[in-house]
Amino acid sequence: QRQMCIRDRFNVPLFSWYYEYTGDLNFLRYRAYPYIRLCGDFYEDYMQKETYGKSYRYTITTGGHEDSWDLNPPSDLAFVKQTFGLLVRYSKLLGVDQKRRKKWNDILSHLPEYKVIMPTKTPNQGLPVYAKNEAGWDLPSHAIQLHAAYPCEILNLHSDSTALQIARNTLYYYEVSQKGFTN
């Protein structure tokens, strides 16, 4: 399971990009969609549905950060969101899996938000940033939480201005102020 959480998800954007670039419906139908659906199947089984306030949410615990186990890291939430978003879109295009779309949309509608914190390390600009997990992990050695922007393309130029500004703050804090992996 750990390898599925860590490694296999990185292939989802590659399959999507190939289809989006070529428009090859045979590739989508026989290669990309089956692979993306397998990743979705994994997430459906692996994620936990829990009560949250007066509703519920789906959570994910992964070990993608050098052997730490994190609840709802933005990097993993981005891959989940990308996977189910593509499954909904591609299943409509291919005319398949209509009965599964309700579940996929439910997951998309009930994913946690990315945790936003005020940075704790200096120097910093005193601006909110995305944390590495729901607990507010603030290790500034890399900006893994921006997988939402790349490779997942969930956070993009069409995202709301607040989310984009927090992404800019995050990149500056983790990669410029704290010098990323350069120290």
Model-flagged regions — what are they?
Residues 2-6:
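Short, small-residue-biased leader/transition segments that mark boundaries at the very start
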Residues 7-16, 75-86, 141-153, 181-183:
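Well-ordered alpha-helical segments within folded domains of soluble proteins
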Residues 17-22, 27, 32-33, 38-49, ...:
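Non-catalytic carbohydrate-binding regions of carbohydrate-active enzymes
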Residues 70-77, 94-97, 137-142, 176:
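Hydrophobic alpha-helical scaffolding
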